[in-house]
């Protein structure tokens, strides 16, 4: 049986790239996240907006904020999210969030165990 690698997708709202751009900076601020970074890889990404309400639908569904009825409905009316794709591939999926904008009401329960 072939073992597959774990997949972690971590989004930290309002955390700037320049704060965690290298391992030493990350280790000083968030040592556990720094250890995860050392085991995998990171990408510098640029958000398409300044607001969580606009950005999260885009991150989850790879669509623009105003696509599929706008941003007020989260991902309810959007195409399949990346979470649903990895779930269909056999991965366990979990969401840990304190953000009220990532709730089931906005469709963010789609694809999570």
Question: Can you say where each PLM-predicted feature lies in the sequence?
Answer:
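Active-site-proximal alpha/beta segments of enzymes that process anionic O-linked groups
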Residues: 4-6, 17-113
């Amino acid at each position: 049986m072939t073992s597959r690698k774990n997949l972690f997708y971590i989004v930290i709202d309002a955390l700037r790239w320049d704060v965690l751009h290298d391992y030493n900076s990350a280790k000083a601020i968030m040592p556990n996240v720094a250890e995860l970074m050392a085991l995998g890889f990171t990408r510098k990404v640029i958000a398409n907006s300044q607001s969580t309400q606009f950005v999260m639908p885009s991150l989850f569904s790879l669509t623009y904020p105003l696509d599929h009825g706008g941003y007020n409905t989260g991902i309810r009316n959007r195409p399949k999210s990346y979470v649903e794709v990895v779930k269909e591939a056999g991965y366990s999926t979990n969401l840990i969030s304190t953000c009220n904008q990532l709730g089931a009401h906005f469709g963010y329960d789609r694809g999570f165990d």
